[in-house]
Regions:
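A donor-sugar binding/catalytic signature common to diverse glycosyltransferases
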Residues: 76-78, 88-96, 233-282
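A nucleotide-sugar donor-handling region in carbohydrate enzymes
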Residues: 114-183, 207-208, 323-330
Length: 354
């Protein structure tokens, strides 16, 4: 089979990669289609080369559509909606597979334009989306992004090579893009957590857009501390960081589900800033994007009401990692699905059988 993966954003690749790996192992022809309008071509070219994956650049979805209609692949994977499905479906079958399992209603609404099949993660999510779109095809497979951790092919980070102390416990701080707690952390916060390694993995947009200079300056200040490693924009995969860390700090990211699926403690920041587009007269946008019907993190792990309360909570979660074990197990079944490292195998089986 000829199978293409639509890479609107570079952070789709960690979700696609385990599936690409399984399909290549079975002898299928696979390639990434990467959008230069959304991704820095110069910055990412060497990263894509290092992945040893075949790829083609297109400017936007219109150019991608033309390529798909010309190549007529058997299957095309999408991480979001796509505007030209009526034309595409005359030539190819399509897959929708989200890059995260976060709380945004858009997780469900991207199925407003149905694809041939959508691969789903947990039981609750499957049930909900089947109720919303009873005529469409959904198949529960799990969360392929985490397969390399569960099948133990992901080795994680070498802390010593990063200049960190392997004898220390490691915190992963992975703030969301919007809302974000990033601005609520002082420039000297690594000094207050000196007994820990700190891995900082922020959204690629925060690092790459000029409008976020203040955030970038704050991150650069953290980078100067010997117990901190800040991931570069080229390190688009969170998976090695998830594998390595002992505890996660975030606020509204699907990373919370992913880390909890590894049965490791998460600490949820109830303090954060909103971008201007969600403030004042635009606050309705925030309610719409994180609506009352969306998934919440209320019982997934410990919550910190403000920055000052964060450290004792971190310490308690590291010393008592079983605090929320039962909650994590339930969230995992409901939202992430099977954690046997075989989501990609189930996906490949489905494509071959259909």
């Amino acid at each position: 089979m000829n199978i293409l993966f639509d890479v609107l954003n570079i952070y789709y690749i960690p979700q696609y990669f385990p599936v690409w790996r399984e399909l290549k192992k079975r002898g299928h022809n696979c390639s990434l289609i990467v959008y230069s309008k959304k991704n820095d071509k110069n910055l990412l070219a060497s990263t894509l080369e290092n992945l040893d994956i075949s790829y083609t650049w297109v400017h936007d979805d219109s150019e991608a559509k033309d390529l798909y209609l010309t190549q007529k692949p058997d299957w095309i994977f999408f991480g979001n909606e796509f505007a030209f499905l009526d034309e595409i479906h005359q030539k190819s079958k399509t897959v929708q597979m989200g890059h995260g399992v976060g709380p945004k209603p858009s997780y469900y609404r991207k199925s407003d334009t149905p694809m041939t099949v959508r691969f789903m993660e947990g039981e609750v999510r499957l049930k909900k989306i089947e109720e919303m779109y009873p005529k469409d095809k959904f198949v529960q497979v799990g969360f392929s992004k985490l397969d390399p951790i569960f099948d133990e092919t992901e080795q994680g980070l070498d802390l010593a090579k990063l200049g960190l102390d392997p004898s220390k416990k490691t915190i992963l701080y992975a703030p969301t893009f919007n809302p974000t707690s990033l601005g609520c952390f002082p420039k000297n916060w690594p000094s207050e957590f000196s007994e820990y390694n700190i891995l900082v993995k922020v959204h690629s947009l925060t690092l790459s857009r000029d409008r976020y200079k203040k955030d970038q300056e704050r991150i650069q200040a953290w980078k100067q501390y010997s117990n901190v490693y800040v991931a570069g924009v080229d390190e688009f995969s969170l998976v090695p960081f998830l594998k390595t860390a002992d505890v996660l700090i975030s606020e509204a990211s699907s990373t919370l589900f992913e880390f909890a699926a590894l049965d490791k403690p998460v600490v949820i920041c109830d303090f954060y800033d909103l971008k201007w587009s969600y403030k004042g007269i635009f606050k309705y946008r925030f309610a719409k994007r994180f609506g009352a019907d969306s998934v919440i993190y209320k019982e997934l792990g410990a919550h910190a009401a403000n920055y000052k309360k964060l450290k004792p909570i971190i310490q308690d979660e590291i010393e008592n990692p079983k605090n929320y074990k039962n909650n994590r197990r339930k969230y995992n079944i409901d939202h992430v699905g099977p954690t046997d490292g075989k989501a990609s195998i189930r996906i490949a089986d489905y494509l071959e059988n259909n």
